[in-house]
Structure formats: C-alpha cells, structure tokens
C-alpha cells in the first residue's frame, strides 16, 4: 500500500487525515480508509497512524460495513451483491469513525456513480527525460500510455473520471532449489511518476481521445511480458473538484492515501466540531478496467532481470527466488495473461 508523503507543497497544520474509498466492482466490494494524526515538526509533518478506531462505511439504507485495521489501512472486502451491504446504483455512502479517544468523524454522503467504460487504451514507445545524481538530464527509452473515453453518459449527463495504474510483469528466476526448480513469477506494482489524473467534461468536449496517463521507463520489467492495468473510476463532481485541486498543488504522484500538498478542503469533518483541521476525502466509485499489453519486442527487447549485474548479490534476491521481488509476487498465472 502507498505511504503518505507529507513533504509535498506547504506543510499541513496539526490535524487528522481521513482518506479512502469504496469500490463497487463486478466481483467484490472493496473499502479502504487511511486514518492518521498529523503533528507539526519544524517545517514538516509527522504522521502517526490511528490503529484502534471503529471504522464503518454506511449506505443510504443504514446498512454498515465494518473495516478492520490491517497493514496500515482499515479494510473490508465482501462479494458483490451481498444483501447485508447493498451497493445499488444511485445509493449514497459515507464513512463514520469513532476513535479510542471518543473522537467522531463523518464524511458527506456520496452517491455511487454509474460505471463509465473506456473506449480504448494504447502503449507507444517513446523517451523519458530523467535527471541523474549529478543533476544532468538525459533521455531514456520509455512506454507512454494513453486512454480514450467518453466524458458523458448515454443520457448526456456529465461524467468525471479518475485513473489508477498498476503495472504487471513476468519474471523468471534462476533458483537452484531442487524442490521448486526455476520459477516464473507474476508481479504487480503501482505505476509511479505522474500526477493525479482527473478529467471532467467541458462545454464542447464530450469525448477524451488519446489522453496521456504518463510514461514508464523501460527496464527488465518489460523483458518477459508486461501489462499496464488502468482502473477508470467515474467519481462525483465534488470528488473531482477535490482531486483537481490536489493535482494542481502536488509536484509528484499522489495516491488516494496521500494528504494534499496544502489545506485542500475535503468531505470529512469532526462530528462535534472539536477538531478543526480534518484533511482527506472519502469517495465511492464503480470501476472499470482495461489492460494494455506490451511485448518484449515492442519494448526493444530489454535485458532480463537475471542474473543480477553485481559480483556480490545478496544471498536471497529476485534471481534466487522471484517471490521475494515484491509483496505481490505470485506463481499463479493471471487468467488474462497471454504472453
């Protein structure tokens, strides 16, 4: 899970960060909420996680989904269509929090938007300008990802869109384990390096064509097959306004779990008004997904991850066991993997 970077933009005052989302997908309903307390220290913030709160997502029928604290985030996952917590179209949802110190926080209810399917997405070879340790700039090979999508629903209603990209790649290790032998791992990692991407319709634009979502440097991750999964979220106008402000302030990529680079007003407040500074946003979305493959040939046949280019590699590394390459490494081949 992403960490909070509070060094971006202006330091925030002491307060609380409550950020998260509810995703009503085709297979599962997922909820995640970050809850942290901020302390000013000189010219920066020091976040402290709040780990023993009661966190619930509530729908407009009064049904509640309780979130449990795991690995830094309050989380819950239930099967889609679970009658104990309905996620029907046009229902509204908000988060309610009660800390161990009896501090209560609540978000403004958000109506669940309809799914908005992208028209298509592409991957194109290009270059990316990077800065080395000496401060000199040079161009390196990269893949640029672009998406096309409507910005209005079929009935003409405006749609506001947010994207999250996740990179998937294949890697073969050089294991000498006589039990497992050489393994092929499938690994995913959050796409790094671009700002928050949110788009809404203008008076004369109802379709977005070849909109750039960012560039990814070509490395060994493209040597055996690579997919970029694009999660498109149709969000409310209010959520769009919030993330649009965050995007204009942030100098690097922010995830939904990162505080804005300044005091951007979100939709969460202290229930009794005792805490003035509450930062973050809780939004709801019904996501759609599109995966963009890149073959090794399309990426220029980059060098594979193994063997490591060092004389003294650590005793256990991605080449002795590809499962240690990431917390998300798996030997299970995704059903959609075609390489």
Where in this protein do the model-derived segments appear?
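A sequence/structural signal for flexible, mid-protein segments enriched
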Residues: 1-339
